Each structure stands twice: as C-alpha cells, then as structure tokens.
C-alpha cells in the first residue's frame, strides 16, 4: 500500500495543476487516471486544438499546455497510476483508502476528484451505417489535423469544438462547411466573431437551419453528406470528411457509488472550497457543480488552489497555512528555495 498526503483522481489540466499546487503547500501526491497517458481530454480528444483563454498565452494547443503543466508539477515528484480507475473507497479513521482497477492501494488524508467528464465518449449522430465510415471519413476527435489538408470537410455542431475546429482547419482544408440547426452558437463570442468573419470571406460556408440526414459513399470513403431542414428539404454537400461535434457522454463509473451528492453526472460541492458532502473529499474542474459554475480550465485552476489551501490543515493535523506567494518560494533561477 502507498501512503501519501493527497490522491488526485484525473490527470487532465486541472488535475496536473492541483499536483503543482499541492507541491507548493508541501503535500505529496499520487495521481490516478484511466487513460494510458496524462492529459485527459486535451490529449485523448483534441491534442492539436487551439486554446485561447489561458492567461499569458494568446493561443496554445492542448498538447503543449499539458507538457507545460507536467513540467510545472515535475519538481514535486508526483506518482502516476495510469491506465487504471479508482473503483473502491474506504474510510479508516482520518484516512481514506482507495483501491484501483489494477488492485493498487493508496492511503491518504485528502482526495481531489478532477476527473473532468469522468469516463467519456462521443455523442454520435443517428445516421444509418455511420460505423462504416468511422475512422476513415468520419472522426469524432482530432489528433493530427494535417491529415485533413486539402479535404472538403463537413463539421456539425455549434459549440466550442465545432467552431474552433472550423476556424483552425480553414487554414489547410479545401472547403469547410459548418452545419448547425440554428444561427445561434454556444462557442465563445470571440470564436463566433472569427467564424463569421471567415464566412464572409468565403473560407467557411455556414449551413444554418440544417441537420445531418445521411451519408453517401463506398467502402468507408465519403463522397457527400446529406442535410435536411425543418421542412424536410434536403441538400447535398460534396465532402470527403465528416466531423460531428455533439459533446461527450459522461459516466462517473464507481465514483457514483461513493456516497457523494451527484446531480446529472456532476458532483455537488460548496462554492467556497469545493468540498463535497464528505469531509476531506473535494471535486474540481468540469466534474464539479455549484451555483455560478463556469466550465473553464482557468476556473479549474483556481478551484485547485482554493481546495488545497483549505485541505492544508487536515493534511498537517490542524496546522495553519502561512500563505506565501510563489515568488518567495522560488529563486530568480526558477528553482525552489
């Protein structure tokens, strides 16, 4: 059995920043993640997706953000338990014992759940024979955007993923169609502004008021995408790639059986320190829910700092935290004093 101060469930960007923040407070961390590598959705789903709302980075791709967060956490020597899930929780006095799907046992005083969407998978459009095209012409995630160079692409959806990828791929694709059932997008206002500018210049064609209806092609090679409007009028889009971005299916898995207050696949927390209904267990990032919650990586970073600040006295048996700015803990060379 491993003994540590904090167990962090989830090695996405928020979980990785929590490792750094815990290290700044002198806490040792073990991290559990179901994926084979760290990074969460940023690596598994969209490593090349540009992110625009990380402070000091006008633009950074998801993969690079994860690399920087890993480097930031590395001095504190976290222990990663990858390709395994946290499946069992037991309370032993002031300690928690977690068992993973690989029978790893970890004992800690604090648990930080930063599991993002939990176990996730794409919401697939209900199109006949779509599985025949998956992996060849239909993709739900993008790990190498260069393979779409010169292609005619239909992107479906109105959220951040659909809009941001339409903008990004317009630089290399021959043609981009963005299909959305209405003229209102849920992506960030700045992304929508860029999208409409590109539509005005002809770089992107907006197909508004339509939904996906059928696929046409042979042997997994797409030739066209059929869309229809509310009056059942159809329109054919000549394309060899379809990228449907309709969000993710969430599944909390074993976490749902831990006695936590769960609502619609999210864990309810207080909005001061992000503690759950079980003292010593916190939830941060996309998996956490409270009044006024914003699902932004930046907000998750702040939740990590607040929750670990609050957890300090539990880890160190009632000792008060003497708050210091990071500049007082590191020298000019960036090394810990």
From Swiss-Prot:
Enzyme nomenclature, EC number: 1.18.1.2
Known cofactor(s): FAD
Statement: the UniProt record of this protein carries the keyword NADP: yes
Enzyme class: oxidoreductase
Cofactor note as given: Binds 1 FAD per subunit.
InterPro entries according to UniProt: FAD/NAD-bd_sf, FAD/NAD-binding_dom, Fd--NADP_Rdtase_type_2, Ferredoxin-NADP_redctase_2
GO MF annotation terms: ferredoxin-NADP+ reductase activity; flavin adenine dinucleotide binding; NADP binding
Gene3D superfamilies noted in UniProt: FAD/NAD(P)-binding domain
Catalysis: reaction(s): 2 reduced [2Fe-2S]-[ferredoxin] + NADP(+) + H(+) = 2 oxidized [2Fe-2S]-[ferredoxin] + NADPH
Binding site for FAD: 33, 41, 46, 86, 120, 286, 327
Keyword Nucleus: no
Assigned keywords, A-Z: FAD, Flavoprotein, NADP, Oxidoreductase
Pfam hit, one: Pyr_redox_2
Family assignment from sequence similarity: Belongs to the ferredoxin--NADP reductase type 2 family.
Oligomer and partners: Homodimer.
Name of the protein in its database record: Ferredoxin--NADP reductase
Annotated organism of origin: Rickettsia canadensis (strain McKiel)
